[in-house]
Amino acid sequence: MSLLLAKLPEAYAPFDPIVDVLPIIPVLFLLLAFVWQASVSFR
């Protein structure tokens, strides 16, 4: 996979922000689940 990215740096460049955001997505889902659970239990 890294070989492919090394061959296509200009094609991969637009996806850099997506790769930067990827590790944050599970945290966002965790926060969303926590807020949803809290709102459901507070009803």
UniProtKB/Swiss-Prot annotation:
One Pfam family matching this protein: PsbK
Protein's UniProt keywords contain Phosphoprotein: no
Annotated HAMAP family: PSII_PsbK
Official protein name in the record: Photosystem II reaction center protein K
Originating organism: Oltmannsiellopsis viridis
Prosegment residue ranges: 1-6
Disulfide feature: none
Membrane topology, as annotated: Single-pass membrane protein
BP-aspect Gene Ontology terms: photosynthesis
Source organism, top-level taxon: Eukaryota
Family according to the record: Belongs to the PsbK family.
Keyword set includes Magnesium: no
GO cellular component: chloroplast thylakoid membrane; photosystem II reaction center
Subunit structure: PSII is composed of 1 copy each of membrane proteins PsbA, PsbB, PsbC, PsbD, PsbE, PsbF, PsbH, PsbI, PsbJ, PsbK, PsbL, PsbM, PsbT, PsbX, PsbY, PsbZ, Psb30/Ycf12, at least 3 peripheral proteins of the oxygen-evolving complex and a large number of cofactors. It forms dimeric complexes.
Signal sequence extent: none
Residue ranges of the TM segments: 18-38
Function in brief: One of the components of the core complex of photosystem II (PSII). PSII is a light-driven water:plastoquinone oxidoreductase that uses light energy to abstract electrons from H(2)O, generating O(2) and a proton gradient subsequently used for ATP formation. It consists of a core antenna complex that captures photons, and an electron transfer chain that converts photonic excitation into a charge separation.
Matches recorded under SUPFAM superfamilies: Photosystem II reaction center protein K, PsbK (SSF161037)
Subcellular location: Plastid, Chloroplast thylakoid membrane
Keywords on record: Chloroplast, Membrane, Photosynthesis, Photosystem II, Plastid, Reaction center, Thylakoid, Transmembrane, Transmembrane helix
